[in-house]
């Protein structure tokens, strides 16, 4: 399952890993998958996505979700940014 369902998706050559993670961040936010969003926010950073690109991705999705969901996504992103600053 991990190799077939996850590894092959993340290793496809059409998109670089940072862009792929940004797409996954958008999908997780839009579908209210907060635990996965948390993981992929970290993943996007580790894959080389800039903080501004992640912020812009969440901003683009914010028009599609409720104000409460958008606020929750911003809080989660702020926590991830704080954790990244510690390391």
Whereabouts are the PLM-identified features?
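Acidic, glycine/proline-rich low-complexity segments that act as flexible tails and inter-domain linkers
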Residues: 1-17, 46, 62-87
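Short, glycine/charged-rich beta-strand-loop motifs at protein surfaces that mediate ligand recognition
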Residues: 12-13, 26-31, 44
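Extended alpha-helical surfaces
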Residues: 17-20, 41
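Short, structured motif recognition centered on aromatic/hydrophobic residues
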Residues: 20-28, 37, 57-58
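Short alpha-helix boundary/capping elements
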Residues: 30-34, 65-66
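Short conserved catalytic/interaction loops centered on acidic-Pro-aromatic/His motifs
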Residues: 33-42, 55
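Accessory, usually C-terminal, subdomains that scaffold auxiliary metal cofactors
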Residues: 47-51
């Amino acid at each position: 399952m991990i190799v077939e369902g996850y590894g092959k998706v993340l290793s496809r050559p059409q998109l670089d890993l940072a862009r792929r993670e940004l797409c996954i961040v958008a999908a997780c936010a839009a579908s209210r998958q907060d635990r996965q969003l948390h993981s992929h926010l970290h993943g996007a950073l580790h894959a080389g996505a800039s903080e501004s690109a992640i912020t812009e991705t969440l901003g683009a999705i914010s028009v599609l979700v409720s104000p409460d969901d958008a606020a929750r996504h911003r809080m989660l992103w702020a926590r991830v940014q704080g954790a990244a600053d510690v390391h």
